[in-house]
Amino acid sequence: MKIKKSVTYGSHQLTFETGEIARQAHAAIMVSMGDTVVLVTVVGAKSAKQGQDFFPLTVDYQERSYAAGRIPGSFFKREGRPSEKEILTSRLIDRPIRPLFPENFYNEVQVVATVLSSDNEVDADIPAMLGASAALVLSGIPFNGPIGAARIGYINGEYVLNPDTSALKQTQLNLVVAGTRQAVLMVESDAMELSEDVMLGAIVYGHQQMQVAIDAINELADEAGVTAWDWEPPARDPALAVKIAELAENDLRAAFRQKQKQVRSETIDNIWTRVFTELGVEDGEGPDAQAVKEACFALESRIVRSQILDGEPRIDGRDTRTVRPITIRTGLLPRTHGSALFTRGETQALVVATLGTGRDEQKIDALQGDYSERFMLHYNMPPYATGETGRVGTPKRREIGHGRLAKRALVAVLPSPEEFGYSLRVVSEITESNGSSSMASVCGGCLALMDAGVPLKGHVAGIAMGLIKEGNRFAVLTDILGDEDHLGDMDFKVAGTENGITALQMDIKIQGITKEILHAALVQAREGRMHILAIMRQVLPARREDISEHAPRIIKIRINPEKIRDVIGKGGAVIRALTEETGTTIDITDDGTVMIACVNAEGGELAKKRIEDITAEVEVGRVYDGTVLKLLDFGAIVSVLPGKDGLLHISQIANERVNNVGDHLKEGQVVRVKVLEADDKGRLRLSMKAVATDVADNAAT
């Protein structure tokens, strides 16, 4: 039976449909918003695999080129591996729904969102998130939803719900928020140095507005009739938890006072190996291995969380507001354009900035059309950063997500193309990781760009905040460790300048986070950010005055657009010869802007002069140094500027009578000529005699 539910959501009509398409899936929802249509399906395994000890949720968001009336540009003319946009949207859907599955639910679940129709004014991410929420509710899979999702803009001091793509060009804020009826679960945003109050207001506003979508999903589920799965969580054995606590609690408390991550991890591993042996898990005579693992994790969590809530020092000895020790080095790689080594505790990022030309911009083939990005930030975290072995190669989803977050943080302070005509690439190599490596990439990226001489509008720093909450007691943690992220209730990353926030990312694992807690976290994050900014300014107060000697120099000039063909030449012959001769790279836009990139300044100036000569207009009455191209019986053809030739008549060569042109001129000879006339076809009449007369007159004067 086909069921349809529509509501007004912002300036668009939001429609959910089910019961017609993809009926073999456990649930399928067609979501429409404007002319954007997304099909979201959910399929779940009825039982968990033997020995499964984690929740295997997979979210795949995929865009089809036909959705925008396009044919893929690849050789095979079909969609290939996921684009960065698809990967980021998959993560955006995954993050708010993952915490809503019950603990110990290990059945495989797959969510697939396919964009079937794309409206240039409506991004498919919000419809896809809402569709995933609705499909999970209709599937009957254990899920504590639904969730709502909304995009919030901030234009002229007002919050805007689900702004169109064109409106986003004017907004100071692009924030996506998702949550249940009771609580916010996820926030992802970039901003133009906005205050904590404005950011918090946007989150609260988004949560209020999304209730419309949540109500629509609940009404759809009521009308469809949902059959809940017959799933019960495995019964816990209180006696097992007591036994494990007797065997390990004292040793664990001592282990969690070890400040070095590797030493602490090794000590804890040894404790659990001993516990497994004493309980007889390995030989099959003791309790179930999965039950023991869960009890061990619960004990770790209880120890760390209770210590923090009781006001005791954190794992590494800090209080809740202290940032780990920071060391910074800049300019450490001699041949790169800019580099920085940012170390905060046991998290370290080696960040490198590279300056390029317009042709180095990243070309992106998107559903909304092709465009280019002048700023790229790539994040790499090899396995050695955590003391492990593993696959090295193409970036994983996590690396792409962290890179995009760091990029969002820096975009607000970049100079405009008119101020600084370079394309920019920043690469963050995470060489050590113990929490908040993406925020280390923000700090290191800012310093590397300034080391490269990029005129940023200000320093940018990032910090990761955590939360421990039990009942009415809570503690906000500044600059969290990896263990605190793992055992805590929130991962809240905030980046910005001294003037305001430029990027924010929040993932909450529990319900019941209040506005007051979020405000406390934002205020505490500002304290930490200001502390880091002060250290960064001490090391590098401002950008380098000169760019690296190894970076390309860019010379920018403007020419008459009608002269572009002259610079390029037939089949590109002129510009090709020019670049080869001068050792430069030359890019010309349709409006006549010419960008000359060179490592050698002399080559750049030579290319500039040649282009100016090619595009220069010949002035009547002006004297030029011309080259004799060809001798004729009645005179000679002389080139006064590239592509500008004129006739030097035999009567204009000298004051005396000339019988033979060859007696006075030779091909290749440089002579001074005056332009006497230029007709409407551009033909020039030249004179050497007039130059001599002018010289004589000046001498007499």
Curated annotation (Swiss-Prot):
Main location: cytoplasm
Alphabetized CDD domains for the sequence: KH-I_PNPase, RNase_PH_PNPase_1, RNase_PH_PNPase_2, S1_PNPase
Keywords: Cytoplasm, Magnesium, Metal-binding, Nucleotidyltransferase, RNA-binding, Transferase
Start and end residues of each KH domain: 552-611
Compartment(s): Cytoplasm
Signal peptide coordinates: none
Cofactor(s) this protein requires: Mg(2+)
Cellular component terms per the entry's GO annotation: cytosol
InterPro entries documented for this protein: ExoRNase_PH_dom1 (IPR001247), ExoRNase_PH_dom2 (IPR015847), ExoRNase_PH_dom2_sf (IPR036345), KH_dom (IPR004087), KH_dom_type_1 (IPR004088), KH_dom_type_1_sf (IPR036612), NA-bd_OB-fold (IPR012340), PNPase (IPR012162)
EC number: 2.7.7.8
Enzyme class at the top of the EC tree: transferase
A Gene Ontology molecular function term of the record: 3'-5'-RNA exonuclease activity
Annotated positions binding Mg(2+): 485, 491
Origin: domain of life: Bacteria
PROSITE patterns associated with the record: KH_TYPE_1 (PS50084), S1 (PS50126)
GO biological process, one term: mRNA catabolic process
SMART domains to which the protein is assigned, alphabetical: KH (SM00322), S1 (SM00316)
Any one Pfam family match given in the protein's UniProt record, by short name: RNase_PH_C
Catalytic reaction annotation: RNA(n+1) + phosphate = RNA(n) + a ribonucleoside 5'-diphosphate
Gene3D superfamilies: GHMP Kinase, N-terminal domain, K Homology domain, type 1, Nucleic acid-binding proteins
Domain S1 motif residue range list: 621-689
Family indicated by similarity: Belongs to the polyribonucleotide nucleotidyltransferase family.
Functional summary from the UniProt entry: Involved in mRNA degradation. Catalyzes the phosphorolysis of single-stranded polyribonucleotides processively in the 3'- to 5'-direction.
HAMAP family attached to this UniProt entry: PNPase
The name this protein goes by in its record: Polyribonucleotide nucleotidyltransferase
Organism in which the protein naturally occurs: Nitrosospira multiformis (strain ATCC 25196 / NCIMB 11849 / C 71)
